[in-house]
Swiss-Prot record:
Catalyzes the attachment of valine to tRNA(Val). As ValRS can inadvertently accommodate and process structurally similar amino acids such as threonine, to avoid such errors, it has a 'posttransfer' editing activity that hydrolyzes mischarged Thr-tRNA(Val) in a tRNA-dependent manner. ValRS has two distinct active sites: one for aminoacylation and one for editing. The misactivated threonine is translocated from the active site to the editing site. It is found in: Cytoplasm. InterPro entries: aa-tRNA-synth_I_CS, aa-tRNA-synth_Ia, Anticodon_Ia_Val, M/V/L/I-tRNA-synth_anticd-bd, Rossmann-like_a/b/a_fold, tRNAsynth_Ia_anticodon-bd, Val/Leu/Ile-tRNA-synth_edit, Valine-tRNA_ligase_type_2. Residues 1-37 are annotated as: Disordered. NCBIfam families: PRK13208.1, valS. One of its GO terms (cellular component) is cytosol. The lineage of its organism: Archaea, Methanobacteriati, Methanobacteriota, Stenosarchaea group, Halobacteria. The keyword S-adenosyl-L-methionine does not apply. Belongs to the class-I aminoacyl-tRNA synthetase family. ValS type 2 subfamily. This is Valine--tRNA ligase. A motif ('HIGH' region) lies at residues 72-82. The gene is valS. Keywords: Aminoacyl-tRNA synthetase, ATP-binding, Cytoplasm, Ligase, Nucleotide-binding, Protein biosynthesis.
Amino acid sequence: MLPGCYTHRLNMSDTQDPPQDESTTDESADALDGEYDPREIEPEWQDQWVADKTYAYDEDADTRFSIDTPPPTVSGNLHMGHLYQFTLQDFVARFHRMRDDTVYFPFGYDDNGIASERLTERELDIRHQDYPRREFQEKCRDVCTQFEDEFTQDVQSLAISIDWDNTYKTIAPDVQRVSQLSFLDLYEQGREYRQRAPTIWCPDCETAISQVEQEDKDKHTKFNDIAFDLVETGEGPADEDATFTISTTRPELLPACVAVFVHPDDDENQHLVGGSARVPLFEQEVPVIADERVDMETGSGIVMCCTFGDQNDIEWYQAHDLPLRLAIDESATMTDVAGEYEGMHTTEAREAIIEDLREEGSLLESRDHDHTVQVHERCEEEVEYLVTEQWYIELLDKKEEYIEAGRQMEWYPEKMATRYEHWIEGLEWDWCISRQRDSGIPIPVWYCDDCGEPVMAEREQLPVDPLSDAPPVDSCPECGHDSLTPEEDVFDTWATSSLTPLVNAGWDWDADSESFTMELPELYPFDLRPQGHDIISFWLFHTVVKCYEHTGEVPFENVMINGMVLDENREAMSKSKGNVIPPSEVLEEFPVDATRYWAAGTSIGDDFPYKEGDLEAGERLLQKLWNASRLVDQLTPAARPDEPEELAAVDEWLLAELDATVESVTAKFEDYEFSKARNELRSFFWNTFCDDYLEIAKQRLSDGEAVSTEFTLLQAHRTFLQLFAPFLPHITEELWERCYEEDSSIHTTDWPTSGGYDADLEAGETAMEVVSALRRYKTENGLPLNADLDHVEVFGHIAGFEDAVAEAMHVAQLDTYDEAPDITTEISGIDLDYSLVGPEFGSEVGAIDAAIEDGDYEIDGDTLQVAGVELDDEMFAVEESRTYSGEGEMTETESAVVVVR
């Protein structure tokens, strides 16, 4: 479990101290006596919420909000990306729960497939090849269970309001059934096929992978210029010593070379087309063919086609009906096609072949070269292209349909819809869903040993394992042969995790009605799919495909895409860079609520740097909230007063401003604009309520004006706690219980709504500016905040708030005026934007600076005339000084001028 001890202690001295005047406080014990100790309080509430089932889903509720949460792979410990992503999801869940929705907020573990196998091998220091399949699967289950238990504790310690009764595992029997049902349904629809064809292959994991599981990796290698003997040109036999040059980074593919290609616009090499060439070292003769896919700008412009080096090789092989020469096997070992290099790993064979080419005189040049290769995203091993038999889901014939399905969903942010569409537009392969691994969900198929016909499991049997379960028939339905061989492959993990909306909704086959049904149909389509932008092509696209094919509907109404967590230098975190920051280290130093404040610090979709300063800002907000709450608690009676028939102007104004904040923050939550909601709420609470209104309230209560102020303090305080609750669940729950002694959790109370208060907001805001200006005046002049001021003049609109300002700042005489005072404005300087001025005027910048220094310039409207040139308003800013010539000291706010006399 993540540790709950903090090296930072919350120092309460930087916010309002509770009043010492006992006449203004209740005689009962202080509900907030002492300091806030998150080290003790946060774990207590985490345990209490789970014990009380505070976040349980209510199937009988009238309104609901369903979230299709991403099941993390069980491949290690919690990282900052998890913390960030889970917290964003939790903001949504907590907000909707308080909006009177019952929230379906499940948690899943994607614990089948390659990630689980590699974790098991790493943890136990074993290889899956060294164990019988069943035994290795059991080891995977044991290791995954251990990590899942630890992971669950870690997620709970982040205050994520998961309903833990709705937890699923993708390897569990009920999920296996859903996955196998999906396979059978798509097969019956004609959307699946089995084919022996070129496949993207990971030699390290020894399995086929899909296009989506590849990623680019920069690699430093050698570009080798190799001489091929020309046997014939397109016009007849070639000269005895005629050669041409092929440039390649992969000479180990020479034994797999089956053709040479020239671009039809390559005039210099057109004479080769129709002829043939001999491959050095391996001596096979291959044809020279014209094809427009040749890149004339790379290397010599003449390209060898090998089976297979890349996607182009596959396309040429298919388009020109070329022979098949497989020189590399499933473990990246050279085959007998490679002759004397058989048994070597490809990297070893590459060096040996280069050396032999050099000795033979066929290696013309070998030079350094940086290029991009395709690697498996799980292990970063460079992929190969092998011919294997695999199961596929058809995608390419419905690309436009899947794009249109994406347009039926609301995207937050909108720009991520474009990324989804671009991925589909760039698809070149159908989805390979079979994997040659030990741990995974079995493909429910047997094959006839005679005719090869696939025999599908019956729906009632599922889940099945063909390796241990009997087939549904005794003989092949196609030819009658009585020998059936079980499928050994398992599903790609994404073939199962793409079904999470159906898993959570309880999708199943009903034999009585002979149709698919859902146990919780009210959940589907889900209201929200939250996830990172890095798995749009993995999880989101595949979920749309599967659910759309099974139900005819898109699986969710809204999609919320978050960015990645970067380090403080805005670089991606990685073990190789040594810049990974474990959440455990962060939570040893800071409260959980402070990390949640940090997580709300950027717009969704944007990559997000980890900055310790943001956590410190969150910690300061906790201090401010605790101290302000303690002050409110001591200023107000134990029993909440009824709303008076008439509120004082300043109280009505505060509640009207709070109404506007409630409406604005609510709208931002609805649009998933958490950073804007957080910043607006913090600003109003800190600057307006704490710094301005509380000072006024203290003074008004000391003057005996209690009822209106007490009601306003409590109304505002309760509202602030509820608005902060999704961001800061621990401290708001603690304050709610201590201050209001209510039985229910703050997180199940109703979200605040507008109280319908009406006030002159402009006048009130200006009055608060005046209070701030006078407080600043006292501080700058070394005066205590309760020092008396004899005479203050305010030039600005504060009608109705004069008494509040005078009382709060101890002003004996306060005069207000609508018109501005006599102020002289002079230009004190010109500030140039050199990023624009430099490129535009070059060597003339020096003369421009000198003329400005001498005051030799003229401002004409929005332009600056100086040194014989004209600068537009984007290139400069005018600096002004303002001087008050009357009696007293002037200070200005955004909306008023204040003079202390």
